[in-house]
């Protein structure tokens, strides 16, 4: 992808920076501040070119705008991407500390128009480090006055989304269904446990062989990484990186439901159309995985109790039922229906704010 096409984006702001000493590129993209300051996690990963990092940040920021709106949260959408010069695990502590300090400086210069939190390859400890330089950070450790990890709340929301999608697809409950979980990290691992407790038969895959071995020891079945997208299952739960369902994959995916925690699971609109035409019911990711945003914004901005946050995460299932109702009534894909619902809620929130 060219840098020109990556910059052809309709969001509000793009901030980039390069650090010669570490070789890291920094990207912050603010998609919308209509409902409040933009918010979105910090993702650290390797990219083949800067254009890919810009595109990833833009897509993720857009998803955050939708996620905040559909969840009735008073924030906009943004995202940070740190394009690393080497795999995260190979970066020494002093280099990582410098990378985080520079990222915090970039955030602080935005003067509260953007807040960040943990994402791929960043955690609460990293948020504590960012907080040494800037106040505009979610997901700090409990010891630093933050809400801690949002992983379990995210998993709860995805689990409720999965149950709602399975029920709407006419499959009843998860009991006895085969669920393939791709990615056994903090969210995917918790989701797998919840699905197993509900009686699902689990197939699991992860790049981390220790995670897979642990799952197998619990009685689950491992699937080779190269076989994930061709293995038959009732429910496919992508919980790793996004973009896994391309048009080619959508034509051959052998499942009835797609409901996972990964962001931007569907690579493009055509893939969504193909899934819909084939009768594969997809839980739009920005609805299904909103539990993390609910946890961080609810606890650290709105002052919600743990019980209220949990209730709001469980209510993701109800939100999906509204999405499916719009999809059925209007004859559109669930993704289009979810965007319609997000737009409706954003307009309602804007009207309420304007008349308050």
From Swiss-Prot:
Pathway(s) the chain acts in: Amino-acid biosynthesis; L-phenylalanine biosynthesis; L-phenylalanine from phenylpyruvate (PDH route): step 1/1
List of residues binding NAD(+): 43, 119, 150, 154, 183-189, 206-207, 211, 240-241, 261-263
SMART domains linked to this entry: ELFV_dehydrog (SM00839)
Catalytic-site annotation from UniProt: 79 (proton donor/acceptor)
GO molecular function: nucleotide binding; phenylalanine dehydrogenase activity
Major enzyme class: oxidoreductase
GO biological process, one term: L-phenylalanine catabolic process
Coiled-coil segments: none
Residues at which L-phenylalanine binds: 67, 118-119, 263
Keyword line: NAD, Nucleotide-binding, Oxidoreductase
EC code(s) of this entry: 1.4.1.20
Annotated catalysed reactions: L-phenylalanine + NAD(+) + H2O = 3-phenylpyruvate + NH4(+) + NADH + H(+)
Modulation of this protein's activity: Subject to competitive inhibition by 3-phenylpropionate for the conversion of L-phenylalanine to phenylpyruvate. Subject to competitive inhibition by D-phenylalanine for the conversion of phenylpyruvate to L-phenylalanine.
Quaternary structure (record): Homotetramer, dimer of dimers.
Family: Belongs to the Glu/Leu/Phe/Val dehydrogenases family.
Functional note: Catalyzes the reversible NAD(+)-dependent oxidative deamination of L-phenylalanine to phenylpyruvate.
Record-given protein name: Phenylalanine dehydrogenase
